[in-house]
Amino acid sequence: MGKLTILVLVAAVLLSTQVMVQGDGDQPADRNAVRRDDNPGGLSGKFMNVLRRSGCPWHPWCG
């Protein structure tokens, strides 16, 4: 049983090494991405966005 465990661990290390070496080298999209402005209306726009996303029950506020 001990030899089987060692064999599985060695296989896992070899596979992970192969994946790292053969990777395409691109950076993940979120590492250097520019943050999107979800609230272009400033603080009041942010408040309205929160109300809209939460299903605002008070329609004069939600528009």
Swiss-Prot record:
Stretch forming the signal peptide: 1-23
Secreted as a keyword of this entry, yes or no, is yes
Its cellular-component GO annotations read: extracellular region
Query: Which cystines does this chain contain?
Result: C56-C62
Which InterPro entries does the record match to this protein?
Answer: Conotoxin (IPR004214), Contryphan_CS (IPR011062)
Q: List the Pfam families hit by this protein, alphabetically.
A: Conotoxin
The protein's location, in the record's own words, is: Secreted
Where does tissue-level expression of this protein occur? Expressed by the venom duct.
Keyword Ribonucleoprotein found: no
Residues with the modification D-tryptophan, per the entry, are: W58
4-hydroxyproline sites (modified residues): P57
Cysteine amide is found on: C62
Chief location bin: secreted
What keywords are annotated for this sequence in UniProt? Amidation, D-amino acid, Disulfide bond, Hydroxylation, Ion channel impairing toxin, Neurotoxin, Secreted, Signal, Toxin
Q: Which GO terms describe its molecular function?
A: ion channel inhibitor activity; toxin activity
Which residues does the propeptide include?
24-54
- Protein family per UniProt: Belongs to the O2 superfamily. Contryphan family.
Give the comment on domains: The cysteine framework is C-C.
The protein's role, per its UniProt record: Its target is unknown, but this toxin may modulate voltage-activated calcium channels (Cav) or calcium-dependent potassium channels (KCa).
Extra information:
Exists in two forms, due to cis-trans isomerization at 56-Cys-hydroxyPro-57. The cis conformation is the major form.
Its name, as the record gives it, is: Contryphan-Vi
Q: Which organism is it from?
A: Conus virgo
